[in-house]
Curated annotation (Swiss-Prot):
Neurophysin 2 specifically binds vasopressin. Vasopressin has a direct antidiuretic action on the kidney, it also causes vasoconstriction of the peripheral vessels. Acts by binding to vasopressin receptors (V1bR/AVPR1B, V1aR/AVPR1A, and V2R/AVPR2). GO terms for biological process: vasoconstriction. Glycans are attached at residue 133. This is Vasopressin-neurophysin 2-copeptin. The gene is AVP. InterPro entries: Neurhyp_horm, Neurhyp_horm_dom_sf, Neurohypophysial_hormone_CS. Interacts with vasopressin receptors V1bR/AVPR1B (Ki=85 pM), V1aR/AVPR1A (Ki=0.6 nM) and V2R/AVPR2 (Ki=4.9 nM). Interacts with oxytocin receptor (OXTR) (Ki=110 nM).
Amino acid sequence: MPDATLPACFLSLLAFTSACYFQNCPRGGKRAMSDLELRQCLPCGPGGKGRCFGPSICCGDELGCFVGTAEALRCQEENYLPSPCQSGQKPCGSGGRCAAAGICCNDESCVTEPECREGVGFPRRVRANDRSNATLLDGPSGALLLRLVQLAGAPEPAEPAQPGVY
């Protein structure tokens, strides 16, 4: 009987510690995650001007959003970092954050969102000397383009994003 107590104690100890022993848990255990401060997510996209919103979503104020494209490949690295991150200016939709002008993203998809249109962090104009592929749209042409984008996205508000540029 004494020969069986040592293995039984060892197995009991292993059962209690296996929750964070076999999984990649942070220092302090899973409950310590709420104590950590959120960091800014990794930069991504052309020139590192965007921020990751999920493993396949890269968005920036001047870029728009890249979903499932080569520009968003760097965002897969977020899965391997131990600390949580947060991108975006303000909360929107169901658990999302404003990612670009008029776009709300969570870690799985992006949708058009009126409350993300204009405000802090989403400039209406792009600097003329900026070498990005953005165009200067202000006035009637910009309003028309924004309205067309809203009409195109209105029927499918919760449809998951497909690979492409938004």
